């Protein structure tokens, strides 16, 4: 199962690093802050994706590691893509 991260802040960065160290296949990161995605990808030896769609296509599971306030808008964007067979997890929780 190939894992992709939407959001490359502290949670996405740390969780991706943990997964890679555990031998799980991480495809990489997409973030509205390109520099954060580049840094997380470099640190984990993965890829920084230029578009959300390319990350979705490359991944079987998607971790939303964005702030609570961004979950709804990110999910609205995700619904535009073929999500059949994909697992979507979010790592926020103050609101949900």
Model-found features: residue ranges?
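NAD(P)+-binding Rossmann beta1-loop-alpha1 motif at the extreme N-terminus of oxidoreductases
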Residues: 1-50, 54
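Rossmann-like NAD(P)(H) cofactor-binding subdomain of soluble oxidoreductases
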Residues: 44, 49-96
């Amino acid at each position: 199962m190939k894992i992709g991260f939407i959001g490359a802040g502290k949670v996405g960065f740390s969780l991706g690093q943990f997964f890679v160290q555990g031998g799980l296949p991480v495809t990489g990161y997409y973030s509205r802050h390109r520099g954060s995605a580049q840094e997380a990808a470099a640190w984990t030896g993965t890829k920084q994706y230029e578009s959300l769609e390319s990350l979705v296509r490359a991944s079987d599971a998607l971790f939303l590691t964005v702030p609570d306030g961004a979950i709804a808008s990110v999910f609205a964007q995700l619904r535009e893509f073929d999500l059949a067979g994909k697992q979507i997890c979010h790592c926020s929780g103050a609101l949900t």
